[in-house]
From Swiss-Prot:
Subunit description: Part of the ribosomal stalk of the 50S ribosomal subunit. The N-terminus interacts with L11 and the large rRNA to form the base of the stalk. The C-terminus forms an elongated spine to which L12 dimers bind in a sequential fashion forming a multimeric L10(L12)X complex.
Alphabetized InterPro entries for the sequence: Ribosomal_uL10, Ribosomal_uL10-like_sf, Ribosomal_uL10_bac, Ribosomal_uL10_bac_type, Ribosomal_uL10_CS_bac
A single Gene Ontology CC term: large ribosomal subunit
Gene: rplJ
Molecular-function GO terms, alphabetical: large ribosomal subunit rRNA binding; structural constituent of ribosome
Protein name as annotated: Large ribosomal subunit protein uL10
Superkingdom, taxonomy of origin: Bacteria
PROSITE patterns: RIBOSOMAL_L10
Length: 182
């Protein structure tokens, strides 16, 4: 029996190393991480939260703080390590606004989910910073607005360029009618 528990511990250590490595890889690729306290969150509420986070293209993960701190070490998100105390969860996304919006909205309706802070790139954010980020339009909305701003001058230029040609055509048409009448 003693050999069996040693094998299980080795397996646990291997699983933990793999988890830390996968979390570190996520931190290397993502642009935003938010830390929340989920003390007392029911399974049903957690399931709803996960679904909303997933629908926004983000991830919500409850992780052991010690393992999360190991994964954060040496990354640009290292500044959020002090937030990892007690029952916490990490959320991340490539679109920083999406994950912040979902978590802020859910925290408004469920007091068991408490925002602790986060990080956007190398910038550590407090709770107010995460809430301010949630107020911004999403990345897709900003892209659409930018395309609209870029295309508006082009359509105006095309309209201006076409106007003289139309005026010339009307002038030539008037001369042609005048010559036919004469």
């Amino acid at each position: 029996m003693p050999g069996r528990s040693r094998r299980r511990r080795e397996l646990d250590r291997t699983e933990k190393r793999e988890f830390v490595a996968s979390l570190a890889a996520v931190f290397a690729e993502t642009s935003m991480v938010v830390v929340t306290r989920n003390d007392g969150l029911t399974v049903a509420d957690a399931t709803i939260l996960r679904q909303r986070v997933r629908a926004a293209g983000a991830t919500y993960k409850v992780a052991k703080n010690r393992l999360a701190n190991l994964a954060l070490a040496g990354t640009r998100f290292e500044g959020i390590s002090p937030l990892l105390k007690g029952p916490t969860a990490l959320s991340w996304s490539a679109d920083p606004v999406a994950v912040a919006k979902v978590l802020v909205e859910f925290a408004k309706t469920n007091e068991k989910l408490v925002l602790l802070g986060g990080a956007l790139g190398t910038q550590t954010l407090n709770v107010d910073g995460v809430k301010a980020l949630a107020e911004l339009p999403s990345l897709d909305t900003l892209r659409a607005q930018l395309v609209g701003l870029i295309s508006t001058p082009a359509t105006r230029i095309a309209g201006v360029l076409q106007a003289p040609a139309g005026q010339l055509a009307r002038v030539f048409g008037a001369y042609a009618k005048k010559d036919e009448a004469a």
